[in-house]
A protein has these predicted regions:
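Short acidic/polar hinge/loop motifs at secondary-structure boundaries
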Residues: 73-101
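Transmembrane beta-barrel wall of Gram-negative outer-membrane proteins
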Residues: 128, 135-166, 170-242, 264, ...
Length: 755
């Protein structure tokens, strides 16, 4: 549950790309859907960094966690332990996928974000089936299917299977696949005179390597560009170790244990949902959603790095079976083993009715989340090479080790629950044919009861240990129970006014508050003095214009977040020494976005978007844990990883009624790669393209090209660079570093068969 990167707005269309499938919504009059309000749809899976996740566009705020909902409830309650990609994919089980706006999300869930709004196929009276198959040049095999139909006049059924076999763009040596995911869905629906009731079951089993295979070494040139290290091709060469056993200290008992790479990525969950939709005699629409999910395995592994250095004989580093000291490039590497068990019970009920010009909605959330989680960490030194060797460190006293620094870097533990009980109301009021007002409010009672270990971590840290710190304080390392009872609230107001048939204005203001969540207590956690309300205001305003050729919106946006909690691992520049520090800070972003849908002639469509934004840190201060390294004051610095300029261009053309060509261009402007804004990456284009051919009413074939400009580069942050100052930046010209990279040039092929 290490610190997550900064959050992102999700923009979607229903287009296939990467290792997760997407289905096209089928509109059928006699098909039972779950009755959601569908939002604007954009590219769901066009992600140039990760094939298993929806595409994300940054807006400069720390992540508010899960932004994917299935049948009106979170697909996973929190992705901090039970990750979204381990339990949800946009597959053939879904009837439709749309968006929830930030205003709706704030009121219905307490979270300000654009969110995926997905709904299951429930069936129809006639039999229908769909089979999707996808593959690519690297050997990816993806299969998913759904069958649905009628059992009798009053009963419907649905069943789906999803299978993903993804080796990635290179083969890991310690396992066959970088992502192996299985999803199974089954459900029955009983048709009522004025509604329906459905029971759905879902089973997920998934293993994903994640950051174990998503990092690589490169040469940072110094001007924002990177070069490949000779013999190491970014995106197609593995920086994960060969395999074999490793040693770690279990944070739960302090025992030294052994494990295998890939053995700590098991995820398994059972889920049962009930959906009830009914139209009452007085015109009220009643929608009830309930879900129980049990994930006895919610595990994953994180890899991290520090500084790359040139090893000498004096470092006493050796490859296996060699008595000659290693004298090549090496990097201090870190590993976190995350072990979790998750269980939640979720209920949402809504009653809605139209009164004259008012559309009123009254809702209730009762969401319970139980978490049992811990992580252990260790450090090792590896060669900077493809499939790096883990080097043995030999000491003057005759001892040696490969793995060290046990639980020195942010081992975590928490066990407990949180519960949200909320009442909300919304009203869409058509004041006049030209003026519409939308407003809503939410009041939430939040209770958390969780174990916390508030003590500074050190090498050998574990539950049950007794430790004396540098200041002479001796403590017993054991959990302490934290109980919080708080009220959260959210409110929103939007107004739109249409001056003419074509031209209008729109403005909205939304605010949501919350207190620290259970996952934020897994580290040292906030003290009582640090426990403060998190407030997120969002204010937007702009113009709209629409005619037969163009649909345009241009808006100015302000959004901020106070008291954000972040656990940051910092490295002493030029070394492999690292420490963990808890940070509480704010962020604010002012931006301007213009989006347009353009239809200049029949068959051609262009989606275009331009964003300029300025996300900056507030009250961001790191007291340096290293002698000789100054403290860091990042106030006013641009948020790392967040580009100030974003451009989207998505042209498509229907050559015939059955053949469609499409392209997708994403430009991400200059992004800073560390907190001090000393290091940065130049702007880059992420590109996709494809063709879809509806051969007949049963068969559709397609091809997709990812990164067709074949750009090779790094993105995100640079390992070990957190405290490098602007004055020191010049020293890092043509410097060896490591970080994440773009997906390589890939061609994918798809076939869909409907019957």
């Amino acid at each position: 549950m290490k610190s997550k990167s900064f959050s992102k707005i999700l923009l979607f269309t229903l287009t296939v790309a990467g290792g997760s499938s997407t289905v096209f919504a089928e509109e059928a009059a006699d098909t039972i859907a779950t009755g959601a309000n569908k939002g604007e749809e954009r590219n769901v899976m066009l992600n140039a960094s990760d094939a298993t996740k929806p595409r994300e566009i940054q807006i400069g705020l720390p992540s508010e966690d899960v932004n994917v909902y299935e049948n009106g409830l979170p697909a996973v309650y929190s992705s901090s332990v039970h990750q979204l990609a381990r339990h949800w994919r946009s597959d053939a089980s879904l009837q439709d996928v749309g968006l929830i706006t930030p205003m709706e999300s704030a009121i219905k869930t307490g979270n300000i974000a654009y969110s995926i709004d997905s709904h299951s196929k429930l069936g129809q009276k006639e039999f229908k089936g769909i089979v999707n198959y996808r593959t690519n040049l690297f050997g990816w095999q993806n299969f998913d299917m759904n069958v649905s139909g009628g059992i009798s006049d009053k009963w419907l059924y649905t069943a789906s299977v999803y299978q993903n076999f993804d080796p990635g763009s290179f083969k890991p040596k310690f396992t066959d696949f970088s992502d192996r995911t299985q999803l199974y869905h089954a459900g029955v629906t009983r048709l009522l005179e004025r509604g329906s009731i459905s029971i759905l079951y879902k089973y997920s089993k998934s293993n994903g390597l994640g950051s174990m295979v998503n990092a690589a070494p490169f040469i940072y040139v110094g001007d924002g560009s990177v070069k490949e290290i000779p013999g190491f091709t970014l995106g197609t060469t593995s920086y994960a170790p060969l395999g074999g056993q490793f040693k770690y200290m279990d944070v739960m008992d302090g025992k030294i244990k052994t494990g295998q790479w890939g053995d700590f990525t098991n995820n398994r969950a059972h889920e049962v949902s009930a959906l009830f939709d009914y139209t009452l005699g007085n015109g009220y629409q009643l929608n009830l959603r309930a879900k129980f999910m049990d994930a006895p395995q919610a595990n994953y592994v994180d890899f991290g790095g520090s500084s790359i250095f040139k090893a000498t004989a004096a470092d006493n580093l050796f490859k296996d079976g060699s008595d000659t000291p290693y004298t090549g490039l090496a990097e201090g590497r870190r590993t976190w083993l995350h072990i979790g068990k998750v269980m939640n019970t979720l209920f949402t009920g809504e009653a809605s009715k139209r009164f004259g010009n008012h559309d009123l909605r009254l809702g209730l959330n009762e969401w319970y989340y139980n978490l049992d989680y811990h992580s252990s960490s260790f450090q090792w030194t590896g060669t900077v090479s493809a499939y790096p060797d883990i080097l043995e460190k030999r000491y003057d006293d005759g001892t040696s080790d490969k793995f060290r620094g046990f639980n020195e870097l942010s081992p975590e533990y928490t066990k407990g629950y949180e519960n949200k009980l909320a009442l909300y109301i919304t009203d869409s009021w058509t004041v006049t044919p030209k003026l519409n007002l939308y407003f809503g409010g939410r009041l939430e009672y939040y209770r958390m009861s969780a174990d916390q270990i508030p003590f500074e971590r050190y090498s050998g840290f574990h539950i049950g240990d007794t430790h004396t710190y540098a200041d002479g304080t001796t403590v017993k390392i054991e959990p302490r129970r934290v109980i919080k009872n708080k009220l959260n609230y959210a409110a929103t107001l939007q107004g739109t006014y249409q001056f003419t048939k074509n031209f209008g204005v729109t403005a909205d203001a939304t605010v949501a508050t919350r207190f620290p969540r259970i996952n934020e207590y897994a580290g040292t956690g906030p003290t009582d003095e640090q426990y403060k309300r998190v407030t997120i205001p969002l204010i937007r305003g702009g113009i709209t214009y629409k005619n037969r050729f163009i649909d345009l919106t241009s808006m100015v946006t302000y959004i901020s977040k106070s008291n954000n909690i972040d656990q940051q691992n910092v490295t002493k520049p030029g070394t492999t020494q690292s420490k963990t520090t808890l940070l509480i800070y704010g962020i604010q972003t002012l931006g301007w976005t213009t989006s347009a849908e353009i239809h200049p002639f029949k068959g051609f469509n262009l989606h275009a978007l331009f964003t300029y934004q300025k996300p900056t840190y507030k009250d961001y201060f790191i007291k340096s844990p290293f002698e000789g390294v100054p403290d860091l004051n990042a106030n006013g610095n641009t948020v790392k990883e967040i580009p100030q300029i974003l451009i989207e261009l998505d042209p498509s053309y229907n050559i015939t009624d059955d053949i469609r060509l499409w392209l997708s261009f994403r430009y991400f402007g200059k992004t800073y790669a560390n907190l001090t804004n000393a290091l940065y990456f130049n702007g880059r284009w992420e590109t996709f393209g494809g063709v879809t051919w509806n051969v007949n009413r049963h068969l559709t074939v397609g091809a997709t090209v990812i990164n067709f400009l074949n750009q090779k580069g790094a993105s995100g942050t640079i390992n070990g660079a957190e405290l490098i100052s602007k004055e020191e930046a010049g020293k890092y010209s043509n410097f060896y570093m490591s970080g994440s990279y773009l997906r390589p040039f890939t061609v994918e092929f798809s076939t869909t068969f409907k019957f």
